[in-house]
Amino acid sequence: MTSRQSRKSKMALVPKQRQNLARTVKTVKIPYATTQIVTTSNPPKKGQIKVSGRQLFMSLITSSSFVVNNGLPTPSLLSLNPSNQYLFPSLAYEAANYDLYRFAKLRLSYVHDTNATVSGRVSLMWDRDSQDVPPNSRVSIPQCTKSVSTAVYESCAIDLPIDDVWRFVRDTDVVDRKLSDYGQIFTAVHSGSTTDEVGDVYLDYTIELKDRQPTASMVQTAYWDVSGVLAKSEGPRYFSPSSDVTFTSTMAAISLQLSGIFNVQVVVTCTTAGTLVVGPNISVIGAMYSQFTTPRYFAQPVLACTGVPNGTPSVSMTGFAGITRITLVITRLPPETRCRNRQFP
């Protein structure tokens, strides 16, 4: 018998059951923890939107002297950013949902509503730097990036140059605004013989918004202390913390330059509470709630502001003593608040 035949005969002696068991043995894999990589894209580029509009933002009042922006005390109030509540009161709420913007069209126009018997001149200007100081004389008008001038009884317009740069929608006060703003615009009147309203200024715009984000706050919160160490403002700019608010240890004054209806909450840390009164460009809707519990005075009025500046502050607090800190919380309300909510709060 050969060796090959010998091996075959030995395999034949192995029981069939044993052979089947050998064939059914399986390899068991030990499980390991696995992870997943999650990527997001919010939103895709095709998700950007385009908005067009025409906004009346100022009615010019002629003057014999050189007056810029109707005498508005706030610097850079007319900066071109969709978050600017003064220039874009409706667009600002839409822009609060996006990170980036770019203008596709900008046209600044003056429409007269007076006749040729009224003297004076009107100038419209655009400056590429939103932090430049306003012009202070007629000589400064041609020094702006672009300008146009005419008699108060002639309409005029200026098309602003457009670039293709995406900028950030400003959702709070920033140190260097020129990085987010597309310059600023100015209006000026001079050489008039009266102080009458002579015409309206409009801004026509087409803007693109992209990169949706959680809605930015539409409530401005600002606070200061008398020593000046603590001063901060967050949210949209209904007023300028640096120029629209003045206060000492015994008084405080606030100037509102925006036309609209606002819910204002004032908290004053003090030793003695005084009175809160409103100026000529403000009317109180309903009853004003106020309370003083040492060491804090609290007031919550609903104010309707005309937006027309004058020498008197919009809100004045007098007769106080020992003021150390002031907190303001301002929210813009819809126009129908005037009719439906006269008893607020």
Swiss-Prot record:
One of its GO terms (cellular component) is T=3 icosahedral viral capsid. Its main location: virion. Pfam families: Viral_coat (PF00729). GO terms for molecular function: RNA binding; structural molecule activity. It is found in: Virion. Keywords: Capsid protein, RNA-binding, T=3 icosahedral capsid protein, Virion. Residues 210-345 are annotated as: P domain, projecting. Residues 48-209 are annotated as: S domain, virion shell. The keyword Cell division does not apply. Residues 1-47 are annotated as: R domain, interaction with RNA. Coiled coil: none annotated. Transmembrane segments: none annotated. The keyword RNA-binding applies. Capsid protein self-assembles to form an icosahedral capsid with a T=3 symmetry, about 31-34 nm in diameter, and consisting of 180 capsid proteins. Homomultimer. Belongs to the icosahedral plant coat protein family. This is Capsid protein. The lineage of its organism: Viruses, Riboviria, Orthornavirae, Kitrinoviricota, Tolucaviricetes.
